[in-house]
Structures are given as C-alpha cells and as structure tokens.
C-alpha cells in the first residue's frame, strides 16, 4: 500500500471572523491511499490541520506524515495519538478504500438520500449590522437552532443582538447557542452567563479559556446557563484523560470535533464516556473541505442524533470540491447521484 498527500489552500468566499482573527484562507492536507499495483483506485481523506488549534500544527505534522508514508509501505503501524487530524484523515482514506473507492465512508439511509441531519445555522463574528443580516438569512432559511460566535464586538451590542432575536422568536420556536471561544474572564463571566440565561439561550461553549479545570468546574456548578466544553477537549488523548476531565469538570455538554480530537475513533470514545456520565454532546465540523465534511456527515448520520449538529454546509470556500451534500431548510442531505470529483482530486499536487 502507498500513501500520498497534497497540501491545499482553501479560500474563503468572504472573510470569516473568529476569536483568532479574520480568516481569508486556510490550509488543509488531502490524503489518498492505494495499492501500487492499481494506483487509479484510491481512497480519499482529509487531514484538516487547524493552525492555532490543532496540537500538531507545526513542523511535526509533515515529519509524522512522512513517517506514516514509510510505515504504510512496509505494513507497519504508526502512533498517531497526538496527531488527531492525521488520524482522522487516515481513517477516512482507509474507509473509502475498503468501501470500494466510491466516497461511501459509512453505509446508512443517509447516503441513499433517505434521511437527513438537522444542523444549526452558524453566524460568524462580524460587526453588528453584518451579524444581524446573517441572522436574518438563517431565520428565513428555516433554521430552528442558530449558533452565534460572540466575543468579537462590544458585549452590550451582543446582548442587543440576542435580544433582537428573542423579541421575534421565543425559546420554544428557536434555540440559540453561543460560543465564546474562551473570550470571557473571571471578572465578567458570571454576570454575562446570567444575562444569557435570562434571554433563554440554550448553552454556551467554552466561556473561559481552556486549561483551568478548577475554574471551569466552578462555573459548571454555579452557572444558570448550561456550559459546553470545546477547546478543553483538545490534547486529551487517552481514555483516562478524557474520563478525568468529565468527572472533574462535569460539563452539561461536550462539543466533538473529530479533526481536533482523534478522528472517528477518538470522538467515539468521548461519546461512550459522555453517555456513561449523562453528559450531552453534539458533533461539529472544523473548517474542513467538502472531502472531510462529507466523511464527517456520513459518520454523524449513523449516530442517531436527536439534536441539531454543528456541521458545515460546504458553502464557505470558493475553491472547494464538488460534494453530494446539500441543504434543505435546516436539514443536511446527501444526493447519491453526486460524488466527489476524483479527476479533480487526481490533479492535485501529490507528494510522495
């Protein structure tokens, strides 16, 4: 067997505001695995490394990738525990290859166009007027759950924005989730959590920065608003580390990003532990291209989820790959008549 990789720069249709600044492009790494006796038949995956978040987002990534290539040639396993995006990309490529190289990563009614996945409508950070415009677009499209990235503009403006939504839609009709990306501090977090709870917000992701478990546990104990851990999960590699986090902090929810926590296998371990401890969860994409997003959605469709998931829609980038995924209202669907364009993938800058 052989493994090749192709670095690829995804270009945003419009600047995307995040807690880490404004993004205009994002690097990713496409993988393909094949039998050298039949190189035209290959399994495809994506290692969607995320600078600033992925624990392996430095020179180690490409050194580990070359080690992985060498080991695959001789049939030797590679320890990818601390390289979650590579783990996820390799899992995808192997599943595609063993499934016949048709872009089917998980067999389910979803890939036959018979079921769909409810997702939240993500509203990116921006100035007040732009965010209100984006909210209106999501509401008119039929979303029943929206997620707001907060922490980029003045707090009073963010409160005004949420109040604007609540004045039109009560909590029974529209669920509002917010993601602070660690943007609050201990001087302001408690009154802000109370204000959000008073406005009927469903939950908040990562109100303070990751890495202070005692403070986060305190917040989870006293907050009137359910707290979901996000960045806090990154870097917890073993089952014991994951279990300790859930038992120490006791969050209401965890947010699972397979690209950042070890792929299908790493995320499934979190799910199993969360279910054992009565912790809620949902799955979120992490700026993957349509290759990774397709592979992620197919897995989520097998989980029998009952709440809105945080999956992307493939509409962020101008140079993305063709995808069988499409949106109807707030439901992500799969068109079995469309598959990833393997000729376009074959034309990438592949490296040995």
Go through the PLM ranges and name each one.
Residues 63, 215-217, 222-226, 231-338:
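Shared catalytic-loop signature of beta/alpha-barrel
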Residues 128-129, 152-168, 184-188, 208-221, ...:
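Active-site-adjacent beta->alpha loops and helix N-cap segments on the catalytic face
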Residues 113-119, 142-144, 171-174, 200-202, ...:
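Short, well-ordered coil/turn segments that N-cap beta-strands
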Residues 1-176, 181-183, 197, 322-352:
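N-terminal capping/lid subdomain adjacent to the active-site entrance of alpha/beta enzymes
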Residues 107-108, 174, 178-198, 211-222:
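N-terminal active-site wall of soluble small-molecule enzyme domains
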Residues 4-5, 45, 148, 176-178, ...:
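General beta-strand structural signal in soluble alpha/beta enzymes
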Residues 126-138, 187-191, 237-247:
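Short, acidic/polar
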Residues 124, 146-155, 177-182, 200-212, ...:
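Catalytic beta/alpha-barrel core
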């Amino acid at each position: 067997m052989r493994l090749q990789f192709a670095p690829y720069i995804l270009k945003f249709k419009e600047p995307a505001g995040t807690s880490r600044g404004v993004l205009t492009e994002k690097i990713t790494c496409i993988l393909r695995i094949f039998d050298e006796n039949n190189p035209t038949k290959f399994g495809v995956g994506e290692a969607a490394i995320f600078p600033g978040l992925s624990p392996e987002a430095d020179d180690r990534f490409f050194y580990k990738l070359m080690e992985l290539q060498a080991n695959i040639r001789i049939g030797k396993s590679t320890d990818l525990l601390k390289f979650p995006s590579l783990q996820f990309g390799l899992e995808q490529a192997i599943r595609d290859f063993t499934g016949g190289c048709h872009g089917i990563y998980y067999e389910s009614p979803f890939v036959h166009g018979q079921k769909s996945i409810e997702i939240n409508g993500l509203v990116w950070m921006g100035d007040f007027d732009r965010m209100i415009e984006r909210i209106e677009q999501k509401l008119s499209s039929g979303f029943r759950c929206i997620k707001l990235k907060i922490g980029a503009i003045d707090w009073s403006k963010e409160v005004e924005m949420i109040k604007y939504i609540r004045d039109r839609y009560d909590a029974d009709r529209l669920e509002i989730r917010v993601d602070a990306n660690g943007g609050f501090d201990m001087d302001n977090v408690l009154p802000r959590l109370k204000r959000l709870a008073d406005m009927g917000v469903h939950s908040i992701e990562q109100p303070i920065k990751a890495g202070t478990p005692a403070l986060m546990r305190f917040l989870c104990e006293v907050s009137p608003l359910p707290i979901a851990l996000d960045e806090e999960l990154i870097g917890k590699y073993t089952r014991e580390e994951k279990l300790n986090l859930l038992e120490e902090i006791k969050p209401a929810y965890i947010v699972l990003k397979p690209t950042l926590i070890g792929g299908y296998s790493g995320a499934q371990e979190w799910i199993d532990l969360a279910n054992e401890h009565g912790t809620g969860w949902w799955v979120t994409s992490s700026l993957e291209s349509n290759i990774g997003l397709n592979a992620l959605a197919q897995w989520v469709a097998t989980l029998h989820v009952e709440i809105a998931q945080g999956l992307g829609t493939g509409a962020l980038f101008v140079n993305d790959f063709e995808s069988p995924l499409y949106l109807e209202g707030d439901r992500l669907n799969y068109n079995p008549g469309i598959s990833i364009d393997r000729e376009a993938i074959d034309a990438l800058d592949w490296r040995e």
